Amino acid sequence: MVKVTSLKENQQVYVLHTYPFKETSLIVEIFSKEFGRVSLVAKGARRPKSALRGMLQSFQALEASWSGIGELKTLHGIDWCDQYLPMEGNSLICGFYLNELLLRLLPKEDNYESLFNFYHTTMENLSQGINIEVTLRRFELKLLLELGYEVVLKADANSNEIKADKTYYYEAEQGALEKFRTEKSIKVIGQTLIDMGNDNFDSATTELQSKNLMRFLINYYLGDKPLNSKQLFLNI
């Protein structure tokens, strides 16, 4: 775990979520390039004339400074560090979904620089409306990989090469199996796994089955508590 024990200045961050704290402040959950997910208190941010109030926007690349040695740090300043990325419609819904995944699955104060950079690119793609479903699948795969839950796509659970014409039953902790063993698995054809492993989502079948597979795996790692954004992205 990365220990945040002193003033951290000009850190690249994204705001994942904010919520009220006491009478005039906010708790700000951020994803930072160097320190991963960090919880900050923005003192007085809910006051009408607060300089922080208009800056704490999700999906925008920001620079923040904070200090503290406990789990809840104190935010000292925040500013834009890139051009504004407009988010609307499905892109906005997807942004909320990805932010909630990070809040739910990322441990606090661990460095995920590679994932941060991937998130940055993902936000740019979403703001431009670039193939939203494929953008989601790529981020979901990257997130699980960074968390140590790699989705193995080129070999089955017995280390045999995936065959395009075979049907598999994918289990979260085992991978692709040729025979059905449990209800906690999802049916997928070999060609879909091969396509995903090659970052190829052109096929309509692959697009649909990859969505179902990733939804199944994400739900497995989330556990019993559903996402708050679930109703928003059911059709994504």
Q: Model features per residue range: what roles?
A:
Residues 1-26, 31-236:
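Non-catalytic alpha-helical scaffolds and adjoining flexible linkers that form interface surfaces
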